Design a protein with these regions (language model features):
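Single conserved hydrophobic/aromatic residue that forms the stacking wall/gate
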Residues: 1-20
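N-terminal Rossmann-like or analogous alpha/beta NTP/dinucleotide-binding catalytic cores
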Residues: 14-59, 217
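Short, glycine/charge-rich beta-strand/loop segments that flank catalytic centers
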Residues: 32-43, 61-74, 231
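Structured secondary-structure scaffolds
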Residues: 35, 40-44, 48, 88-310, ...
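Cys/His-rich short segments
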Residues: 57-112
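Acidic, turn-prone loop/beta-hairpin segments
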Residues: 312-332
């Protein structure tokens, strides 16, 4: 059964309400809708944490790193840069500051060799091939233990054994794949039918979380990883990544209002090689629509309609549907 996100779960957040609106405009559907503030998610995260802690995969130590107050996020050294004497995040442009605090760590370094073995035994786990090579190179360069809790903020899921700490996003957000399946109720039909997931389709900028951290967490907890992670590219505007600061963001809703949803989908499927970055502009979109859809496809439709009018009087002939025909029609 397909069900849209319940309005009751969205009303508390304008951003979430916007998701519902865009989902309707983009003609998207889903089997379930989950937010990481739900009780079922907190239950899944807490259970996974308890397993990792019991297996001594997590320990308490000190964390130091770059933190952005506006982004509410920590950044590694390679994710920041200098701008006019100040440190900023490369991705958001927000200022960052150095902080030190007590933190729980996941023993990621311990899983370097097991992960490489897992990639070798499951060569299609990461796609496309270029992304797989990036991940393997990153893992081979050496993994450091990963900070998985914070004391600098109070919102979020508390560490079960230490309420002063909040479980950080690495472990929290990724677990939603399991919580949507009612984990830890692993004997239920929903979990058995859909886990391990056959594929995660994610942006290349969060590939490390899904192809390194996530399988490491799962392997450490004795849970099978997903069968495949596909890291798709970015939709670029003017050969550049879209950014508010650059003022080059193209809103898909505005494009759809002008050109239509199917025209936009056609352009993206035709012009963007799946897995690679793709470029979009109004000029390229208009050229594609006029050439392929208005001219080529339009001419085809006109010829077919004229043929049907001449030979069939534009009437669909009687047809006796077989059981297989009806089954296919019911499915779609």
């Amino acid at each position: 059964m397909i069900r849209r996100p319940p309005r009751s779960t969205l009303s508390s957040s304008s951003a979430a309400s916007d998701v519902y609106k865009r989902q309707s405009i983009l003609n998207l559907s889903n089997d379930d809708f989950i937010r990481t503030t739900e009780k079922r998610h907190a239950s899944a995260v807490t259970n996974l944490w308890n397993i990792l802690e019991k297996k001594e995969e997590i320990y308490l130590s000190k964390y130091s790193g770059w933190y952005s107050v506006s982004d509410e996020a920590f950044y590694n050294e390679d994710e920041i840069e200098d701008l006019e004497g100040k440190k900023i995040s490369k991705s958001s442009g927000s200022p960052v500051e150095w902080v030190e605090e007590e933190s729980y760590f996941f023993k990621l370094s311990k899983w370097q060799e097991p992960l490489l073995k897992f990639y070798s035994e499951n060569p299609k786990f990461i796609l496309p091939e270029s992304r797989k090579n990036e991940v393997i190179s990153f893992v081979k360069s050496g993994l450091k233990d990963l900070s998985v809790s914070r004391k600098s903020f109070s919102w979020g899921i508390k560490v079960p054994s230490n309420k002063d700490h909040v479980i950080y996003v690495w472990l929290d957000a990724l677990t939603n794949y399991l919580s949507a399946l009612n984990y830890p109720k692993e004997t239920e039909k929903l979990y058995k039918d859909f886990w391990p997931a056959n594929i995660h389709i994610i942006g290349k900028d969060i590939l490390r979380f899904h192809a390194v951290y996530w399988p490491a967490f799962l392997l450490a907890a004795g849970i099978k990883p997903p069968q495949r992670v596909y890291g798709h590219g970015w939709i670029l505007s003017g050969d550049e990544k879209m950014s508010k600061s650059k003022g080059n963001i193209l809103d898909p809703i505005e494009i759809i209002d002008i050109y239509g949803l199917d025209a936009l989908r056609y352009y993206l499927l035709k012009e963007v090689s799946f897995g690679n970055d793709g470029n979009i502009s109004k000029e390229k979109l208009e050229s594609c629509i006029n050439s392929d859809l208005a001219n080529n496809y339009g001419n085809l439709c006109q010829r077919v309609i004229l043929f049907c009018e001449k030979n069939l009087g534009l009437k669909v002939p009687e047809y006796n549907f077989t059981k297989e025909d009806l089954r296919i029609l019911n499915d779609f």
